[in-house]
Amino acid sequence: DTAPTGHTLLLLDATQSYHKEVARSQGEIPAAVEKLLPHLRDPQYTDVVIVTLAEMTPVHEASRLAEDLDRAGILHKWWVINSSLAATNTTNKLLKARAQNEVRWINQVAKISQDNFVVIKWHPEEIKGATLSNLFTE
């Protein structure tokens, strides 16, 4: 989980700039800082999964995050659409209308992610741990 779109990369960049300044003034960069961005860029070390809701603003924000990651050379492949009403097959009129509105954004994520996405249906309770990982096999 990260800061809003773009802020994460700015924080990484600011951290790197800070440590470059420390290195300039003191002569050394901590190993953890030197390894951070290379680790984030290494698909053998890091998997980046973009998580969004099937709504306009979250999809646009996630799309901008994907663009920022591309610019930073950080690979990302999978997207998760979380808490989808469209995946619940609800019969409630209000929820059904909201579910129909999600379809456009699910299709947008399908396009952006080149069909590398999963949809997790809305659950009334918070899902954690092993239960969460089981949702990906449903």
Segments the model singles out, each with a brief description of its role:
Residues 2-57, 61-64:
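Phosphate/Mg2+-binding loops and adjacent switch elements
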Residues 41-46, 53-138:
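C-terminal lobe/tail of nucleotide-utilizing enzymes
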